[in-house]
């Protein structure tokens, strides 16, 4: 028998900024977790995130997407296909600690079984003219991360850590950018304003474009079993250069290709 999840009281809902769609799945069997029969939930956090410039995702299973909503006044978070007992949302509201979005699969849970629809965590933020992350940190054990943006996502620093998944993005402005991908590809259309970028894809390819001229950067591009390409030229498996400006890009893909392009 499927266990029932008790809905929050009106007071709890108001306090947390949580909007519950009780009839999202209409209780059909196809939306239950195949292993436990637990119902899957949809949760929307629509208030209380105006000053949430420091956000951390710690996800065992699911896809994380950051989108730009040019008409939005503040960030919102929409989560679907959730096991509620695995999900935690923490927001102190005082800007002293990051907003934390956590989805932790129990250690003894058999991930080899069919888990049903993949959980999705979608963070919508206003455009870069009105919203700027101090720090955005995304850790996913099994699932992709995507910046699905036509406008720029801006941050002081961005940290990505994906064990089994790919990262794709359009345009990002960040001073510090770090990505570690154990098994998957990295593809970012434009990284602007970066001072230090470090990307490692242990078993995948790296594709990155940065703003500026080639000699604006100190470079360390390395692969063991693939090719290094810099502005369309195929280099050896290792390419390094120094620069007078304190901007650096380090890209490492031992088993894949490294492709770096500058806009000028």
Residue map of PLM features:
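Short linear S-[DN]-x-LW-Φ motif typified by the pepsin-like aspartic protease active-site region
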Residues: 2-102, 116-137, 145-153, 208-212, ...
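Charged, low-complexity, helix/coiled-coil-prone segments
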Residues: 62-68, 77, 159-168, 194-198, ...
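Generic short beta-strand segments
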Residues: 102-108
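Acidic/histidine-rich helix-loop elements
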Residues: 111
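Right-handed parallel beta-helix
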Residues: 135-180
